[in-house]
Regions:
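Class I SAM-dependent transferase core
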Residues: 1-78, 86-90, 94, 107-117, ...
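Conserved nucleotide-cofactor-binding alpha/beta core module
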Residues: 70-187
Length: 206
């Protein structure tokens, strides 16, 4: 029996307390963000391959990261690692204006088609090096990174985080939450174990 939206939300509800996040997960059609041959499994609580060595993140991880970021309507959000566009879609559904950076032009193009099919607006897609963020639209109220940094948070992403902002990034196999307080100081906290594809510097090879 194929997984269903209702079963996924019931499973997530055991771990996620923010009803806005649960509603966003329920409302964004995940099947539009996976390859056609994976659509039967779209509502499974698992990561799925999307091509190019990349994956669409497990819904529980997406929900956990969104909950940590505390996205308010109208927030300016940097999303690093667009992939199929699913993470950006959830952030936009929470009311954010999203700038999403992807190093692979083919993935970014597919994400644009996926977002359009889902009727998701307020997402600007950028092809570039995600470790550098997107300075023209900075500072951001939240930064979401859907790929794992090897040793540390890229400095450019910290520089682009607004006062009062929150950044979530996997570093190795740990999820790290960084907050910038009203005085500009940074505070780091461990937010649990995760597994992500690596965050790679520079453009994708031709």
């Amino acid at each position: 029996m194929a997984p269903t939206r209702e079963r996924l939300i019931a499973e997530l509800r055991r771990h996620v307390r923010d009803d806005r996040v649960l509603a966003a997960i329920a409302e964004v059609p995940r099947e539009l963000f996976v390859p056609p041959e994976r659509r039967r499994s779209a509502w499974a609580n698992e990561a799925l391959p999307i091509g190019g060595g990349q994956t669409i993140s497990q819904p529980l991880v997406v929900a956990h990261m969104a909950e940590l970021l505390r996205i308010a309507p109208g927030a300016r959000v940097l999303d690093v690692g667009t992939g199929s566009g699913y993470h950006a879609a959830i952030l936009a559904r929470l009311g954010a204006r999203v700038w999403s950076v992807e190093r692979d032009p083919a993935l970014s193009e597919q994400a644009a088609a996926n977002l359009a099919a889902a009727g998701i607006e307020d997402v600007e897609l950028i092809v570039g090096d995600g470790t550098l963020g997107h300075a023209p639209a900075a500072p951001y109220d939240a930064v979401n990174v859907a790929a794992s940094a090897r040793r540390e948070v890229p400095p450019a992403l910290l520089d682009q985080l607004a006062r009062g902002g929150r950044l979530v990034i996997p570093v190795g196999e740990r999820l790290v939450l960084v907050g910038r307080d009203a005085e500009g100081r940074l505070h780091h906290a461990d937010a649990g174990g995760v597994r992500f594809v690596p965050l790679v510097e520079g453009p994708a090879p031709d």
